[in-house]
């Protein structure tokens, strides 16, 4: 039977929620990943160092006994952010600030309205070596939802990189050929995370044969040509600029199967197996370890994990749902098969 042993991976873009939801989902990430970069879009958002440290304590309390998993904490960037906050965050071990353009995604109401007014804050991030994590979509109502990432590149990303050229930027959960091209052409201070859904699915999987609410995420799934461009990027010559970030974003089944359903896919349960499928299909299984376990750590300036995990070429059936607080949660590929299984 084919096996693949790799350095334990890290999830560089994860939503863990809070309360009972946190307790339901954290163990799934902790059994696969050594570390994860924790997104700060709670209600209310994680905007202060005290918020982040309190949230980290709640995450640690939700982990299985004996778990070595480490959450890497971030702050939610707001219009009120200051260079002093950046310095305080750095001193407290916060790894990054996350940009949510106001209204772009779940719990982004407190997001930034004009990033260019925060240039002094971004300059301080560059000085302190704190990363800038970007949800790269414009929110103007006149811009088509399928074009919002591409529009963001010209309107925001390129001008910001020109003004703060040494800022370390992660273009999060990229979904388009344009975003991949930007990262490929930018300096080594610019990298990107890529989700399993954007490597495996296209917008037909969302809309053909009926609306599939469990395939609805933001940024929304794009054309097949974009999916192919992402696969080419993560397996190509400059693959070191791309790394694993699931954007696993749990919502109760009742909130997804809804007249106005929530955006987000829960992939943490079988994340590394889904990525293995991508790399296997691309004939690039030998590049999975760098994507999952090396590139992100290097970009963040942290050591690689010292232990390993082993994947077996053995099919598994993903559960139709799992308990989630008072309700249930539908994982990615629910009820379907994945050709790889992690040996726990």
UniProtKB/Swiss-Prot annotation:
The modification N6-carboxylysine is found at residue 98. One of its GO terms (biological process) is 'de novo' pyrimidine nucleobase biosynthetic process. Pfam families: Amidohydro_1 (PF01979). InterPro entries: Amidohydro-rel, DHOdimr, Dihydroorotase_CS, Metal_Hydrolase. Binds 2 Zn(2+) ions per subunit. Keywords: Hydrolase, Metal-binding, Pyrimidine biosynthesis, Zinc. The keyword Metal-binding applies. One of its GO terms (cellular component) is cytoplasm. Pathway: Pyrimidine metabolism; UMP biosynthesis via de novo pathway; (S)-dihydroorotate from bicarbonate: step 3/3. This is Dihydroorotase. The gene is pyrC.
């Amino acid at each position: 039977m084919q096996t693949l042993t790799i350095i334990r991976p890290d999830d560089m873009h994860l939503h863990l929620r809070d309360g009972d939801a946190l307790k339901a989902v954290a163990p799934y990430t902790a059994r696969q990943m050594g570390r994860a970069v924790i997104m700060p879009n709670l209600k209310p958002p994680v905007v202060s160092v005290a918020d982040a440290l309190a949230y980290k304590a709640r995450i640690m309390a939700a982990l299985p006994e004996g778990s070595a998993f480490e959450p890497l904490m971030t702050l939610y960037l707001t219009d009120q952010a200051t260079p002093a906050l950046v310095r305080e965050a750095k001193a407290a071990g916060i790894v990054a600030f996350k940009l949510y353009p106001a209204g772009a995604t779940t719990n982004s109401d407190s997001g930034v309205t004009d990033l260019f007014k925060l240039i002094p804050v971004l300059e301080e991030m560059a000085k302190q070596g704190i990363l800038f994590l970007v949800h790269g979509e414009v929110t103007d109502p006149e811009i088509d939802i399928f074009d919002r990432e591409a529009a963001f590149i010209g309107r925001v990303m390129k001008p910001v990189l020109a003004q703060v050229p040494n800022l370390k930027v992660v273009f999060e959960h990229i979904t388009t050929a344009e975003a991949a091209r930007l990262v490929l052409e930018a300096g080594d201070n610019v990298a990107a995370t890529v989700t399993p859904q954007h490597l495996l699915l296209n917008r037909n999987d969302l809309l053909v044969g009926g609306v599939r609410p469990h395939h609805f995420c933001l940024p929304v799934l794009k054309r097949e040509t974009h999916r192919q461009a992402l696969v080419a990027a993560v397996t190509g010559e400059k693959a070191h600029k791309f790394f694993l970030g699931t954007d696993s974003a749990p919502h109760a089944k009742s909130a997804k199967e809804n007249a106005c359903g929530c955006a987000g896919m829960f992939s943490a349960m079988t994340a590394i197996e889904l990525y293995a499928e991508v790399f296997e299909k691309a004939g690039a299984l030998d590049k999975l370890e760098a994507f999952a376990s090396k590139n992100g750590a290097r970009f963040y300036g942290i050591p690689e994990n010292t232990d390993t995990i082993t994947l077996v070429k053995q099919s598994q059936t993903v559960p139709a749902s799992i308990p989630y607080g008072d309700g249930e949660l539908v994982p990615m590929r629910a009820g379907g098969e994945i050709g790889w299984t992690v040996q726990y």
